[in-house]
């Protein structure tokens, strides 16, 4: 907290905080030989416990529009394949630490000539998240997703006229268009405007005439805005793995009058 200005009529202060996160697996059970894979998670000595273990996205085949994934041939060379099951069996990669490097908040408070104004923000930097909500909205039109909506990015899907794209073609027979992979790992950095409040306290000289000690009129807005890597992504749902299709806190605007006798 720091006071920028403090006079008889004006008081202006700012504040902020930052928390840094580090973690490392020091030792696993000897039978695990320093590493354990549990579905889409990997635990390895010397590394963060918050890492995912996924098939590696290789883009879109410009000739066919099929989703591609990195795999390995019999000689151990990296090759691209449209068969997700082959990629799953032969080549998966560990992500970097999903946890943010730093998170915290900051804001300001101003009081001047009876008015008071405050702004509160929060932030997160340096982390990653699996955007499962986005992945579900980028399906290829298979029957298992019948009735599901699409993200607007689906307009970028491969067509014979649009071959330079990272969005696979729309085809009801393509089971692997949005399979779990590094394709949907995205930055979890965010800046959120949590609160704005504006108030006015009536002068005491006015209130003394009616026997009231204090009256303050105010208006406040909560959950005002959120800025992230992708519109619609809310990394605040989880900082250890994936988004969970929860509703973002609703934006509210309210006002009131505080009266003290």
Regions found by a protein language model. Name each.
Residues 1, 13-15, 105-107, 195-199, ...:
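Membrane-embedded beta-strand positions in outer-membrane beta-barrel channels/transporters
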Residues 4, 18-24, 112-114, 123-127, ...:
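Transmembrane beta-strands of outer-membrane beta-barrel pores
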Residues 10, 100-104, 189-194, 249-253:
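Residues that define the transmembrane beta-barrel architecture of outer-membrane proteins
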